[in-house]
A protein has these predicted regions:
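Hydrolase active-site cap/lid region
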Residues: 148-203
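Catalytic histidine neighborhood in serine/cysteine hydrolases
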Residues: 238-256
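Conserved alpha/beta-hydrolase
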Residues: 82-104
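Conserved alpha/beta-hydrolase "acid-adjacent" motif
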Residues: 227-233
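Catalytic histidine-centered segment of alpha/beta-hydrolase-like enzymes
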Residues: 253-267
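Short beta-strand/loop motif that positions the catalytic acidic residue
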Residues: 213-215, 220-222, 226
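Catalytic nucleophile-loop/oxyanion-hole region of alpha/beta-hydrolase
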Residues: 100-129, 133
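An N-terminal hydrophobic leader/cap segment in hydrolases
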Residues: 2-44, 51-54
Length: 280
């Protein structure tokens, strides 16, 4: 009886944790920086939602970069990258993914529904800059949302930072980092909930299955000390991608903002990659 009671308590606790993990992360973003003139966006999505963001035009012919933040964040997480890229002449678009920041959305879906925001933003950028090349930088959830979005036409270059290949493994990594071997029990309970909460199958949340279909040069980056998306998983994602591709494993970095962690090496790697494939 005690064993059954313990199992019931564990299931209830896992259900409550699952509720917290998939809750929307709505929060006010506020006005754009006063010293950086941008257009404020409110874009309809093909999922009957609204995506909010900012767009700043760069120099003609330099191309554009769409920036996609990680989970439980918003466009402000990509602001430093956006300003750096804009200084180099790129047009930049940064959005709040669905269920984040000021965008609509009832549940965080770990990439699938967030893909609607990617499609809306890409369509807007291409409409604003006809004939120019467009790159995407996606961190963690943002990169997964791009891979799961099946956006067409697709980007001309892609930077994926700390992107999980498979949601089940991503859950296990995060749970195991906090409670060790108990993840053997808790991970299956959390993974079991996702289809019930989000009306999808776990097989739909495997970005690794879609990286080969990008059809664009890709730079894949992650920290060598990342316990959420391990170096082995990052290499699996890299191996699944088509050429041309590049891999950057950042010494000493965990699952962190790689630009904040190593700004100069980041600029060297990412700007070199974008300049090469956007024809800057």
């Amino acid at each position: 009886m005690a064993g059954l009671s313990g199992l019931a308590l564990l299931m209830v606790a896992a259900w409550l944790v699952g509720s917290l993990l998939s809750q929307p992360d709505h929060q006010p973003v506020g006005a754009p920086p006063a010293d950086w003139p941008v257009q404020t966006l409110q874009l309809p999505t093909d999922e009957d939602g609204q995506v909010r963001g900012w767009f700043a035009k760069g120099q003609p012919g330099h191309g554009a970069v769409l920036l996609l933040h990680g989970v439980y964040a918003d466009r402000l997480a990509m602001l430093a990258r956006a300003r750096m890229l804009h200084r180099q002449g790129y047009s930049v678009c940064l959005i709040d993914l669905p269920a984040h920041g000021e965008s609509s959305g009832e549940r965080i879906s770990f990439g699938l529904v967030e893909g609607a925001g990617v499609r809306a933003a890409m369509a807007y950028v291409r409409q604003q800059l006809p004939g120019e090349k467009v790159a995407v930088i996606g961190t963690s959830l943002g990169g997964a949302a791009l891979l799961l979005s099946h956006v067409a036409p697709g980007p001309d270059a892609v930077v994926l930072e700390s992107v999980f290949p498979d949601i089940r493994q991503a859950i296990d990594n995060r749970v195991r980092a906090h409670i060790g071997w108990l993840a053997d029990v808790v991970t299956p309970l959390l993974a079991w909930q996702l289809p019930l909460r989000l009306h999808l199958e776990l097989a739909q949340l495997r970005p690794i299955d879609h990286v080969k279909a990008l059809g664009a040069p890709v730079l894949i980056a992650a920290g060598l000390q990342d316990r959420h998306t391990t170096p082995a998983e990052t290499r699996e994602l890299f191996d699944a991608a088509r050429e041309p591709k590049a891999l950057w494993m950042v010494e000493g970095a965990a699952h962190v903002d790689l630009y904040d962690y190593a700004p100069k090496p980041y600029e060297l790697r990412v700007l070199g990659f974008l300049d090469r494939y956007l024809g800057h």
